[in-house]
Amino acid sequence: MGATVADLQATNGTAQAQAKHGVSDGRVVAVRGAVVDVAFDGGVLPALNDALVIPIDGAAPILAEVHAHLSDAAVRALALGPTGGLRRGAAVRATGGPIRVPVGDAVLGRLLSVTGEPGDDGAALAADVARRPIHRGAPPLAEQKSATALFATGIKVIDLLAPLAQGGKAAMFGGAGVGKTVLVMELIHAMVERYRGISVFAGIGERSREGHEMLLDMRGSGVLGRTVLVYGQMNEPPGARWRVPLTALAIAEYFRDERAQNVLLLMDNVFRFVQAGAEVSGLLGRLPSRVGYQPTLASEVAALQERIASVEGAAVTAIEAVYVPADDFTDPAVTAIAAHVDSMVVLSRAMAAEGMYPAIDPVASSSILLDPLVVGEAHVEVAIEVRRVIEHYRELQDVIALLGIDELGADDRRIVGRARRLQRFLTQPFAVTEAFTGQAGASVEIADTIAGCRAILRGDCDDWRESSLYMVGTLDDARRKEEAAREADARRDAAAGAASGSAGPQGAQHGR
């Protein structure tokens, strides 16, 4: 029978803490929401980030984390669970170390909380399951491996214009409702299908409904068996939401270090991590910084991002969804996160409104991997030309809106036509949306994407319908769609001609 995480923290840590560190049991002296002050009489205090276990009669124990030493005999801790029912005078047990979460094969296919407790309908974890602390440093610089290998996603616009690095960090920036979570789910699908690696998903401060839907979708698609889901939901205390990425990182680091397996680490949403940190900062009495964020914003983001690293033989590839409040890309949280990523995938509300999914802005998105030494000369040349054509089209949109496209010169009209076709060609159906759209998902090789864009830039598709290039995979798929449309037009014209021919004599007779 499985023990609760809080029980394991207490069982594994209390004897060690009291014997080795001399920390005696404490007692609660104040409760202010999620902040709990604890007094210790032995003269030795638990270290910062150590876990404390607070038993409650008739309820699961509360796990808290030490964040400040108030005096020689008291600490301030942050509860990772609801503190309802907690009273002054309650006993507190020090564990002698940071929170430890389960890792290894036992957690594959499971949904876990910030403390590693299963949140699905599966069996309890065994008491002897391997565990790792959530607080660890980044690998030494000498052991880290730079990210230069391409991480092909099968998503045309990403692979062409903002390629991801295997072992690198990529962030998808966008406001509410532009498709960040759908992109994350598609990338999980790509990882399982293409790389046969492990995926670790951290749901940070997101809706419970979305987490439930993702769990069911993964079960249905068969990818859950190689995925670990770690959730700190929107309704949980800020401490839980703040520590969820560290729990996910501890699990990913285990598979990287102990199993030498490639790991795809997905975090949705990193902005909620910053938001939870701001709440924690306020609860602990720190003065806010710009726009109300915590004064330690930059260091907290850096501590998280620098742990995402690759070593010889195994890579952790991080893909992070970042909510942009009020579509303001100058927000301090957004700029702090952007400073650490290799690839920036910017989602556009305007493109989403036009139905251009994935709604990725081809001009604003960028990647340090878009370099001839990494992806090759041909790739870079096509990417630059695609960006140039689409950017020129955007410059002409105001003129078109005022005067109409017929007032443009021949060269500008040609650029407009090719830019619109490129925008449509860079859309594609996703496997994870097949149940809603009825259209099978398409995964496209980078070579096919480059060849298709080069053909459009060359003018090979100037006489094609724009709709033939919309929501297809390769250019061959678009060609078949165009041929089918032309055949349908020919049949319709033939039927119309036959109908008008048969109506001709009758019309003449009625005229007489």
Swiss-Prot record:
Disordered, as annotated region: 479-512
Location(s), subcellular: Cell inner membrane
GO molecular function, one term: proton-transporting ATP synthase activity, rotational mechanism
Protein origin, superkingdom: Bacteria
Pfam families linked to this entry: ATP-synt_ab, ATP-synt_ab_N, ATP-synt_VA_C
Positions bound to ATP: 174-181
Membrane topology: Peripheral membrane protein
Homology family: Belongs to the ATPase alpha/beta chains family.
Biological role stated in the UniProt entry: Produces ATP from ADP in the presence of a proton gradient across the membrane. The catalytic sites are hosted primarily by the beta subunits.
NCBIfam families, A to Z: atpD
Protein name per its UniProtKB record: ATP synthase subunit beta 2
Biological source species: Burkholderia thailandensis (strain ATCC 700388 / DSM 13276 / CCUG 48851 / CIP 106301 / E264)
Taxonomic lineage: Bacteria, Pseudomonadati, Pseudomonadota, Betaproteobacteria, Burkholderiales
Gene name of the encoded protein: atpD2
